[in-house]
């Protein structure tokens, strides 16, 4: 997971002020530091066939309410259906109310999540901008 976190942080650095430490390592995002301690966080390594393809962290907010805390698909697996399949599998694994958030700078993530959630819910979702882009739906 730590290696995937570094790839995630590298990818995310295009949109944020994430900086490398003097030894060339990105500092851990808060949810990554907490994944082994917080019982409300569920961590997944996404796979395409047998190869690691990314990661997901789901946070339980309340009984049957969830937030997609982190979601990352390696570049070589983007636009292959791997991310869509992983997102749908997570929605099925955790039925209930969901929120999925993206930072305003990450237009590709916004497009991905709108497309995936629209298809999964048949358009039955709400989107707000405060300042993050947030899709909310129940499945």
Where are these predicted regions, by residue range?
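Hydrophobic pocket/interface hotspot
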Residues: 1
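Conserved GNAT-fold acetyl-CoA-binding loop/helix
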Residues: 6-32
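A short helix-loop-beta-strand connector motif used in the catalytic cores of GNAT acetyltransferases and
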Residues: 30-45
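Conserved beta-strand in the GNAT
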Residues: 43-45, 51-60, 67, 72
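A short, internal acetyl-CoA/4′-phosphopantetheine-binding micro-motif in the GNAT/acyltransferase core
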Residues: 47, 71-79, 103-104
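Conserved acetyl-CoA-binding loop-helix of GNAT-fold acetyltransferases
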Residues: 73, 79-93
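Short glycine-rich, basic-tinged beta-strand/loop micro-motifs
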Residues: 91-101
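Conserved beta-strand-loop-alpha-helix junction that forms the acyl-donor binding cleft
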Residues: 99-114, 118, 126-130, 137-138
